[in-house]
Amino acid sequence: VIFSNLFHHILIRYKIHLKVSIDGAEETHNRNRKWVDGGGSYANIIDNCMYFKEYENQTKQSIQAAHVVTQNNYGETFRSVCHLVENLNFKVVDSSIDVVHRWTIDQLDGLADEWEKVLCYYIKRQKVGKAFLWGPVLDLKKYGENNGKSGFCGVGLIQIYVKVDGRIFGCAANLESSGCIGDVENGLSMDRIKRLRKLEEEGTMCSKCNLYRECQ
């Protein structure tokens, strides 16, 4: 996002919760986060840091780093989280796994090692009074509070996922056409939302999900 003073004022005035898509240090981030001309977007995020700080100071809300772990950057997961916390001062890092592509067992094993490093880092910073919030830990806590039931994320109710092509999805775990609920030009489609709410269509990504019975 290219910030303007008006846009920044609106975010602060209405205390809109803000997430910044950033996957780590410059080389890691620019590997997947590119503009249409092929250039990476990391420098643009850094240019907006002064706006981020003012937003947090005035709203008393922390900006979240939306950190996506993919097949070509999972080996840098630990270093990326450290960079976001220590160098860019994010207090909330929402790490999520790219579920669009099928992962191999070896890749998942490697990711598990990185996940463990981040968890140890999370615990260590808590002990020394420099805690940050890490998305996977928050998700596990909420999952336990709901007695193992899902639905706490409020997909389609309090959050949506917008792809770079403008299509809107209710759940980041279903980015197939069956999960599309509208687009930025025409808005949300109530027909599509109602169809997803019924969850009656067989063979869709949603119907195959083992948590869909509790999905909001």
Regions from the language model: what does each represent?
Residues 153-157:
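Short, small/polar residue-rich loop motifs at catalytic or cofactor-binding pockets
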